[in-house]
From Swiss-Prot:
It is a multi-pass membrane protein. Belongs to the UbiA prenyltransferase family. It catalyses: heme b + (2E,6E)-farnesyl diphosphate + H2O = Fe(II)-heme o + diphosphate. Keywords: Heme biosynthesis, Membrane, Mitochondrion, Transferase, Transit peptide, Transmembrane, Transmembrane helix. This is Protoheme IX farnesyltransferase, mitochondrial. The chain crosses the membrane at residues 166-186, 199-219, 248-268, 270-290, 298-318, 339-359, 392-412, 441-461. It is an enzyme of class 2 (transferase). InterPro entries: Protohaem_IX_farnesylTrfase, Protohaem_IX_farnesylTrfase_mt, UbiA_prenyltransferase, UbiA_prenylTrfase_CS, UbiA_sf. The lineage of its organism: Eukaryota, Fungi, Dikarya, Ascomycota, Pezizomycotina.
Length: 507
């Protein structure tokens, strides 16, 4: 016969809890334990009523879990065991309910999305298809397909046309080069509040570069929807799935091009606007068609990757131009101040090869099936050699940044480990011909290499920490006067030399 159900399990189980072990003498160890009467705790009435926990049953879950571990030593062990077994289903139910209650709503949604993605992948595998890659364009295209509102569907499709991740990379390279431009002494904290260039120019540079990149990417998708449909990496693009019409895509590309070049022309300078327009033309008009003609298309695409650093450099140089501010002065300055921009462009040009060679290797058969000529399948041995060759270029390029006065010489030391890492992965990629995980290793090394080099260059920018020190602690007036006199003397000597050369030319 089972005992009657306990109305207040919390109080009863707490009284049944075994006493804690204490260090005691051998004599005290043999003394019988004292029996504590089942009376309410006196001290608890100072704060709240003894029956408050029992009425609210807030501790029943915790106490019942402890009850499963209690082993009674009294004569009524069987009775306690039966009562524990009778309460265990309730405890298990409470435990599962409590766990479900503890899961945050966003965690539940993430779990549901993972289950849905796994189900879709299993269904695609059952049909003999490969699951779609979870890149930004695929996710945006899937989001656009699920929208019921035509406006939201078109906005998501247009965002997918812009290739957000690639556009973000292009914009960041332009912004980093803009920030790396050496700030002249006339923009030092002695005359301005912060040792930086115009933030408004940076804003227009960011907006213009974003729209120019979006225009080029949209035109790229417009040109090759048939080849995109043959590749797992690109078959989920909006034009392949007919999520947006070609007319709307053309309109988006044209408007983005006009907005981007216009923002660069009126907000920055005409030279940067021309570079943005050249980026669109080379990427959409040369690189995209040549992908089906020759493997040399990779070099054309690398030129496109080197243009954004030139845009950032020309944008910064236009603010300190002393002459007419033409493209010759900004890109081919007679004093050699434009060398840093070309070195940064060369760095981005060289980075394209180890990155793309590693990226194209796992999907070389898909490129071949789509009719796109890439070195990964046309000449696999040369594919590894090209990646290795251009990975060695980064060491002299980093040294050139130091020699050009863009960064301190300490940058050559701090950038060496990350350059050595890229070289090591390129050697493995060339030696194993993309096998044994070498392609994946080189890909991730290239992914982390570019932001690492950029961040190190910004940290070692020439004179940056000196200007920060002066802006915080100030500088001596005599020191500033000496620097100003030295600068005036150097300018006077340069003007005198140029005047003498002009007179010799006239004679």
């Amino acid at each position: 016969m089972r005992p009657p159900r306990c109305l207040f399990p919390a109080a009863e189980i707490l009284l049944k809890a075994p006493p804690s072990r204490r260090c005691m003498s051998s004599a005290a160890a043999f003394q019988p334990p004292k029996i504590v009467a089942a009376i309410p705790w006196k001290g608890s009435s100072f704060f709240l009523s003894n029956r408050l926990f029992d009425r609210s049953t807030c501790l029943d879950f915790v106490v019942l879990r402890r009850a499963n571990g209690i082993r009674s030593t009294s004569a009524s062990a069987s009775t306690t065991h039966d009562s524990t077994l009778s309460s265990s289903p309730t405890a298990n139910h409470s435990t599962s309910a409590h766990k479900d209650h503890k899961i945050a709503p966003h965690r539940k949604r993430q779990a549901q999305r993972r289950e849905k993605a796994a189900a879709e992948a299993a269904a695609a595998a059952a049909r003999g298809e490969k699951p779609l890659p979870p890149d930004a364009s695929s996710l945006l295209a899937a989001h656009a397909a699920s929208q019921t509102s035509p406006l939201r569907r078109h906005l998501s499709a247009c965002l997918s046309l812009a290739k957000p991740r690639l556009t973000m990379l292009v914009v960041l390279t332009a912004m980093a080069t803009y920030a790396l431009y050496p700030v002249p002494e006339m923009l030092s904290p002695s005359t301005t509040e912060t040792p930086s260039l115009s933030p408004l120019t940076l804003l227009f540079l960011t907006i213009g570069t974003t729209f120019c990149s979006a225009s080029a990417n949209a035109l790229n998708m417009l040109y090759e929807p048939s080849t995109d449909a043959k590749m797992t990496r690109t078959r989920n693009r909006p034009l392949v799935r007919n999520l947006i019409s070609k007319r709307a895509a053309v309109l988006f590309a044209i408007l983005s091009g006009f907005v981007g070049t216009g923002a660069l022309y009126f907000g920055v300078n005409p030279t940067v606007s021309g570079l943005g327009f050249a980026n669109i033309v080379i990427y959409a008009g040369m690189y995209t068609p040549l992908k089906a003609v020759t493997a040399f298309n990779t070099w054309i695409g690398a030129v496109v990757g080197g243009i954004p650093p030139l845009m950032g450099w020309a944008a910064a140089a236009g603010e300190t131009a002393t002459k007419d501010g033409s493209w010759r002065e900004l890109l081919f300055a007679s004093d050699g101040s434009s060398i840093g921009g070309w070195v940064m462009a060369g760095l981005l040009f060289a980075w394209q090869f180890p990155h793309f060679m590693a990226l194209s290797w796992p999907i070389r058969e898909e490129y071949k099936k789509a009719g796109l000529r890439m070195l990964a399948w046309t000449n696999p041995a040369r594919n590894g050699r090209v990646a290795l060759r251009y990975s060695f270029v980064f060491i002299p390029l980093c040294l050139s940044l130091c020699a050009a006065g863009v960064t301190e010489w300490s940058f050559a030391v701090t950038s060496f480990p990350i350059n050595a890492w890229l070289i090591r992965e390129s050697v493995r990629f060339w030696r194993y011909e993309g096998n044994k995980g070498s392609a994946r290793g080189l890909f991730w090394a290239s992914v982390w290499h570019l932001p690492g080099v950029m961040i190190l260059a910004l940290l070692h920018k020439k004179g940056m920490w000196t200007r920060v020190w002066r802006s915080v602690f100030g500088e001596d007036e005599g020191e500033w006067e000496e620097e100003e006199l030295d600068e005036m003397m150097s300018v006077a000597v340069a003007n005198t030399n140029s005047h003498m050369q002009n007179q010799k030319t006239v004679r």
